[in-house]
Amino acid sequence: MAAYLLAVAILFCIQGWPSATVQGQVMPFMEVYERSACQTRETLVSILKEYPDEVAHLFKPSCVPVLRCSGCCSDESLKCTATGKHSVGREVMRVDPHKGTSKIEVMQFKEHTDCECRPRSPGDVNNGRNPEEGEPRARFPFV
């Protein structure tokens, strides 16, 4: 089986990765595997989650796109973790509902530049729940 997967990977490297762009087309295994790997991806981040002390204001839009680490690691004991970060500015409209005013301003957000799979710390497991999404983990995912 391992030899077969290696042969398929080599074949795709030679011919190029197929792209599942046609609606309803099945995405090939190697493309699924590559696209699900731990890497930076554009993610929408809630401004109020990044700036919880700003609850007196409204923001338009209420979330902004930034690159964040996300994806699957080869083992449940590993977690996709940011290893590099920098700050980026995003223009948003800050609305003060009490004064009836608004202004466009630049707010800073952390953007991930590099990711890798690293061992989970004991605090990463929260009673069988995924701390990033709050969704329960499947106890027997392949049964």
Swiss-Prot record:
The UniProt annotation puts the region (Disordered) at 115-143
Q: Tell me which GO cellular component terms the UniProt record holds.
A: extracellular space; membrane
Localization in the cell: Secreted
Where it mainly occurs, coarsely classed, is secreted
**Expression (tissue specificity):** Expressed by the venom gland.
GO terms classed as biological process: induction of positive chemotaxis; positive regulation of angiogenesis; positive regulation of endothelial cell proliferation; positive regulation of mast cell chemotaxis; response to hypoxia; sprouting angiogenesis; vascular endothelial growth factor receptor signaling pathway; vascular endothelial growth factor signaling pathway
Pyrrolidone carboxylic acid sites (modified residues) = 25
Protein name listed in UniProt: Snake venom vascular endothelial growth factor toxin
> Which species is the source of this protein?
Protobothrops jerdonii
